[in-house]
Each structure stands twice: as structure tokens, then as C-alpha cells.
Amino acid sequence: MSQNLFQILLIFAILAALQVQGFLFPTYSSGYDYDCYGYGNGYGNGYGNGYGYGNGYGYGGY
């Protein structure tokens, strides 16, 4: 049970990280020169940590 819950939270964390990076839907952060840097960073943090929301927001948003 806890394994399924963890997987769901992991997926949401990845999607949130990609969204913050403007990966799924372009946002204000995609207009800057963070494009190529933001993609790799959002992917790496989202997949590597599973908690890429905080990291992606810090790098991509500002």
C-alpha cells in the first residue's frame, strides 16, 4: 500500500518539477535563457531526487 502511495507521490513530484520548468506547458520561466539549462535541471532533479519541485522552482523560476 505504501509503495503505491510513494509511486503516486513520485509521479506528482516529477510532473510538478517539469511544469515549474515550463516543460509541460510553457510558463514565464521558459522565456528566459534558462531553456536548455532548465530542461536538464528539471529532468535531473525530478528523476534523481523525486523531490525536484523545490530545486526546479529555485533554478527555473528565478
UniProtKB/Swiss-Prot annotation:
Residues 1-22 form the signal peptide. It comes from the Eukaryota. It comes from Caenorhabditis briggsae. This is Fungus-induced protein 1. Keywords: Signal.
